[in-house]
Amino acid sequence: KSVSDAQLEQVLGTGYGIFAGDKIREAVLRFSPEAARWVAREKWHSRQSGRLEEDGSYTLTIPYAAETELVMDIMRHGAQVEVIAPDSLRETVRQRLTAAAAQYPD
């Protein structure tokens, strides 16, 4: 079966990465001033929006459907990023960071 570019865009273009889903959500991420200058230059998604804040941090808003690949990209920024919204994504990242920290007991 042939699939048109428009159909592909409809299914894959609104989500994040290669993972698709039914409901499109919006992630709001705040990057530290140290990471801001690098992240502001990155293209995470064709429909992303970003703004440099007065304190030097950078806020990135990005659409996603399935969080799998987005969580991986968030995690690579470690302590330089905070998930502001949605709460479900914030909790997923918090759990992953807690599990990672447990690998390094005092």
Q: Where do the PLM segments sit?
A:
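Short acidic, Gly/Pro-enriched loop/turn segments at secondary-structure junctions
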Residues: 1-6
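Polybasic (Lys/Arg-rich)
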Residues: 8-106
